[in-house]
């Protein structure tokens, strides 16, 4: 194991180098990943986020993995943009069960000018509660990223999904370069980036390596890198894809950790299908972030109490955030709710 792969942050990874990491003996790869992980993080702390779908279904994009796409009949009930107050109530519940970051996702190709004021109010309200804020709203232009940053958004999620070479087999309604441009706008606006991909869509090892190379060779690494295992949903074109080999999934986490040593690597969608032993291996491989709660946008996620029981058995604790005194925090929640109720846009959000 070279020093260059234990502690140094690089942005010049080659396909040959990354494939060599994947092809190491499993235990050697895990040892290397855990060594890198310990050089930058407390190995027994995991960042905990909660994800809420603020607008569900009828998305005009044709992503073959997604039950929210309007192109496929998955039986998903379409919902309009959630009212601001309801979003804040969900954020308060998320904080109460231990989440430190609240992520809000909308099934849009991009947010419209009509939607943006409501979205900005959500960010401000959640931020006032002392939670980190994250959103995934689709493609953004430069002015939208500036507005979100000004409202206090900490993270923007915009996944690359897979390698540039395989991307066209999965999505045709948005280009890879458009995704990279959105990430550049987010970074230029001063926000942190959450960007990763999905395993199990029929991609090759070269594609998995290619995705990680795209992320690791960005001018700055994403602060958060979600690695998703495809959740196969009836009605989507990928519903009959073969399951991902569990060891291959763990290898993906480990290589992500080595390539992006200071990023949080998130064990994301598909965790419901993972047994406790696989999740423990994921943490050993360097995963140090999870989504917490019962629902991950439109598919099941392990129940929160099960997560905490597993954490206790493994000696893992949720990563701490800067805490406000309880009375200060409660006042912030109440003030945020009052401000939303007095806003003209508050009651109209559901009809946006």
Swiss-Prot record:
SUPFAM superfamilies, A to Z: Radical SAM enzymes (SSF102114)
Q: Enumerate the SMART domains for this protein.
A: BATS (SM00876), Elp3 (SM00729)
In terms of InterPro entries, this protein maps to: Aldolase_TIM, BATS_dom, Biotin_synth/BioAB, Biotin_synthase, Elp3/MiaA/NifB-like_rSAM, rSAM
The record's cofactor note says:
Binds 1 [4Fe-4S] cluster. The cluster is coordinated with 3 cysteines and an exchangeable S-adenosyl-L-methionine. Binds 1 [2Fe-2S] cluster. The cluster is coordinated with 3 cysteines and 1 arginine.
**Which EC class is this protein assigned?**
transferase
Which reaction does this enzyme catalyse, per its entry?
(4R,5S)-dethiobiotin + (sulfur carrier)-SH + 2 reduced [2Fe-2S]-[ferredoxin] + 2 S-adenosyl-L-methionine = (sulfur carrier)-H + biotin + 2 5'-deoxyadenosine + 2 L-methionine + 2 oxidized [2Fe-2S]-[ferredoxin]
The chain's coiled-coil residues are none
As recorded in UniProt, its EC number(s) are 2.8.1.6
- Gene Ontology biological process: biotin biosynthetic process
Q: Which cofactor does it need?
A: [4Fe-4S] cluster; [2Fe-2S] cluster
Any single GO molecular-function term of the entry would be: 2 iron, 2 sulfur cluster binding
Functional note: Catalyzes the conversion of dethiobiotin (DTB) to biotin by the insertion of a sulfur atom into dethiobiotin via a radical-based mechanism.
Q: Which family does it belong to?
A: Belongs to the radical SAM superfamily. Biotin synthase family.
Q: What is this protein called?
A: Biotin synthase
Species assigned in the record: Pseudomonas putida (strain ATCC 700007 / DSM 6899 / JCM 31910 / BCRC 17059 / LMG 24140 / F1)
């Amino acid at each position: 194991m070279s020093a260059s792969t234990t502690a140094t942050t690089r942005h010049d990874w080659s396909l040959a180098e990354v494939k060599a990491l994947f092809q190491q003996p499993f235990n050697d790869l895990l040892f290397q990943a855990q060594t890198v992980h310990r050089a930058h993080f407390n190995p027994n702390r995991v960042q905990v986020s909660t994800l809420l779908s603020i607008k569900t279904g009828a998305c005009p994009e044709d992503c073959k993995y997604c039950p929210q796409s309007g192109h496929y009949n998955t039986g998903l009930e379409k919902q309009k943009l959630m009212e601001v107050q309801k979003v804040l109530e969900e954020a308060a519940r998320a904080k109460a069960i231990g989440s430190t970051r609240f992520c809000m996702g909308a099934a849009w190709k991009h947010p419209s000018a009509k939607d943006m004021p409501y979205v900005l109010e959500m960010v401000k309200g959640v931020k006032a509660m002392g939670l980190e804020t994250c959103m995934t709203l689709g493609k953004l232009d430069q002015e939208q990223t500036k507005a979100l940053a000004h409202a206090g958004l900490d993270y923007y999620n915009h996944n690359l999904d897979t390698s540039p070479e395989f991307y066209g087999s999965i999505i045709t309604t948005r280009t890879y370069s458009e995704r990279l441009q959105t990430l550049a706008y987010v970074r230029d606006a001063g926000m942190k980036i959450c960007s990763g991909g999905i395993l199990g869509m029929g991609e090759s090892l070269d594609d998995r390596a290619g995705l990680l190379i795209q992320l690791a060779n960005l001018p700055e690494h994403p602060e958060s890198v979600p690695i998703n295992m495809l959740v196969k949903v009836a009605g989507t074109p990928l519903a009959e894809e073969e399951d991902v080999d569990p060891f291959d999934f763990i290898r993906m986490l480990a290589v992500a950790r080595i390539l992006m040593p200071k990023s949080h690597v998130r064990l994301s969608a598909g965790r419901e299908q993972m047994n406790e032993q696989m999740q423990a291996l994921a943490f050993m491989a360097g995963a140090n972030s999870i989504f917490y709660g019962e629902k991950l946008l439109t598919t099941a996620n392990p129940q929160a109490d099960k997560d905490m029981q597993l954490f206790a058995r493994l000696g893992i604790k949720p990563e701490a955030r800067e805490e406000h005194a309880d009375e200060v925090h409660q006042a912030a929640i109440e003030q945020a709710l009052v401000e939303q109720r007095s806003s003209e846009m508050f009651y109209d959000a559901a009809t946006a």
